[in-house]
């Protein structure tokens, strides 16, 4: 890669960033982690990649108080509420990198192009029941929906749905019924499913019904999740620190190459990104190349069950701003059920939490 300045790379313990850091000619690598055990920190795994490739490795460990304190600034630079906690990690990662380089490489796009998300394996799993007539699967789905949350329930429900119904992208957090329960004002716009139905129809028409379910899922993510979340937060969090982020996997030639690959080249042998992993294996430690997709592990699930965060979120959920938009007793129920480990409501809580912080930053604080 040609550049007039020293180039760094964002480095997690995964295959995408590991390959970029190893093969691109980057000079330095940057990783963030959390002091919540290996499950929520990829620092040690990233260090092995950096050691193998001889990269100078910079690490930032983010405390939960730092994370909380940064939220107003993160929401300010995002310009809009974003229910994706990894934006905060990217904020700190960009800040760390900006102290050393002007340009960094990042692995955005590889999962969408080469089939890296675990949910893309679902169509293959559902083939086990494909021999059952759809009308029967639909009937079983209705019965399963009435069951308590037991193992296998979700599979039965999703087996009775077409991909156009069951997959609306990685950003799915609240169903329409849940939205109606927590919001004081009725949502007048189309539901997420209704919004995407036109896209699915156009996709079907353009490809004359030739796309497999996984390819439809990739198309949704490439057209909505990637530009609406992944690239937005990378761009805005890096620009908050005057850092330029480049995303080589989204080069036009790579995009066109990946688009021609059959499904079997992406999901095979029980793994995601099959052909990609094969192609880059020589650049990475074996354990890195064989790792399952983890995403950006953020310990908000843990922190929301700890007393300090629980109290801070309770204060927000009972504020006058929360009262304006939400049935606060429903918010507190989500929070309490999560703290008591009755459910994992972390993403639902986080989505409301970031909206309230964004609203306070732009409308309450600014008006003062």
What are these regions (language model features)?
Residues 55, 86, 99, 103-105, ...:
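Adenosyl-5′-phosphate
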Residues 1-5:
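A long, amphipathic alpha-helix that forms part
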Residues 24-26, 43-45, 74-75, 118-122, ...:
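Short, glycine/charged-enriched secondary-structure capping and boundary segments
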Residues 58, 79-83, 125-131, 264-267:
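Short, polar/flexible loop-turn hinges at active-site or ligand-entry regions and domain interfaces
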Residues 43-77, 192-201:
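A conserved beta-strand->alpha-helix junction
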Residues 92-151, 225, 230, 234-254:
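Active-site adenylate/phosphate-handling loop in enzymes that bind or generate adenylated species
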Residues 6-53, 58-59:
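ATP-dependent adenylation/pyrophosphate-handling site
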Residues 15-16, 35-37, 65-66, 110-112, ...:
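Short, solvent-exposed loop/turn segments at secondary-structure junctions
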